[in-house]
């Protein structure tokens, strides 16, 4: 039985205004009073509240194109992302230790027939029309994975916005199925097998695939033509997770399944909008 994980991220929202005061450092309304914002902070290094598993980012979307086409700039960009080297007191990069890799649905191969207007929101897939796997696909993503490995990154998360178009109900990488999964009823096992096979391929290539995130922000319908995506109900996610668990076990992989993906904090802990797509923690854990 694979492990089931939940990784939570913090979204910080910043508001800006065109009405900048003449003296930004002053406050207190019309009084002109200066308000002190000094704070005293004490850090106890001996007390641990949580463990950070990794510091990561995602290759979705433009790195796929930078890695494939921008050969003059990609080496420096990858250094900025992954290097932890410090020279003369200056870091050469931000030292990412985790890299999130998009398992695209194949809309890039469809071109304009994909229905996705923005070319940068189309993504390649390893799955071909005859349902074989072509490991020469996703060249740009493979470049960044290899560079991450060179710089010592040892945690990779495979994630999916949509099932491969060969398995979707509408043959597209975006959904027209409302809040339900854009996945044929008889293709849950096929989709799971595909994700597990990609994970095994990269494990065999020497990459540590720590997690697979099989769905992305499932509370949204993704029924526009802006990018790849699919809505999912909790019971559909559970069914897919069981199939994926079986496939990972069969292949002898220790890769964990990342559940609890959510488009909004509140979907995690309470019923919001659609009960069948929210209260995620109670539904899965």
Q: What are the language-model segments listed below?
A:
Residues 6-7, 34, 212:
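Short hydrophobic transmembrane-like helices used for membrane targeting/insertion
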Residues 13-37:
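Bacterial Sec-dependent N-terminal signal peptides
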Residues 1-9:
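Sec-dependent signal peptide recognition
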Residues 9-10, 50:
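Residue-level signal for mature regions of secreted extracellular proteins and peptides
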Residues 11-12, 77:
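Disulfide-bonded cysteine motifs in exported proteins
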Residues 189-211, 218-285:
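Active-site neighborhood of glycoside hydrolase catalytic domains
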Residues 38, 43-209, 235, 242:
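N-terminal catalytic cores of secreted or lumenal carbohydrate-active enzymes
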Residues 57, 101, 158, 214-217, ...:
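Conserved beta-strand positions
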């Amino acid at each position: 039985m694979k492990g089931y994980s939940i990784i939570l991220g913090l979204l910080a929202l910043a508001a800006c205004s065109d009405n900048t005061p003449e003296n930004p450092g002053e406050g207190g309304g019309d009084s002109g009073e200066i308000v002190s914002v000094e704070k005293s902070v004490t850090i106890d290094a001996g007390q641990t509240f949580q463990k950070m598993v990794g510091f990561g980012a995602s290759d979705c979307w433009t790195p796929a194109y930078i890695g494939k086409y921008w050969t003059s700039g990609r080496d420096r960009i990858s250094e900025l992302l992954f290097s932890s080297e410090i020279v003369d007191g200056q870091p050469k990069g931000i030292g990412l230790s985790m890299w999130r890799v998009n398992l695209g649905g194949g809309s890039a191969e469809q071109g304009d027939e994909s229905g996705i207007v923005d070319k940068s929101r189309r993504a390649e897939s390893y799955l071909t029309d005859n349902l074989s796997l072509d490991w020469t696909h996703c060249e740009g993503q493979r470049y960044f994975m290899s560079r991450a490995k060179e710089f010592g990154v040892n945690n990779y998360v495979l994630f999916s916005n949509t099932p491969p178009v060969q398995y979707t109900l509408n043959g597209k990488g975006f959904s027209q199925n409302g809040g339900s999964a854009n996945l044929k009823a008889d293709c849950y096992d096929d989709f799971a097998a595909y994700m597990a096979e990609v994970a095994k391929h990269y494990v065999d290539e020497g990459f540590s695939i720590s997690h697979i995130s099989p769905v992305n922000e499932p509370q949204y319908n993704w029924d526009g033509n802006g990018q790849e995506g699919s809505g999912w109900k909790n019971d559909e996610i559970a069914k897919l997770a069981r199939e994926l668990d079986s496939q990972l076990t069969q292949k002898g992989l220790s890769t964990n399944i990342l559940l609890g993906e959510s488009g909004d904090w509140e979907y995690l802990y309470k019923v919001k909008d659609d009960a069948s797509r929210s209260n995620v923690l109670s539904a899965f854990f």
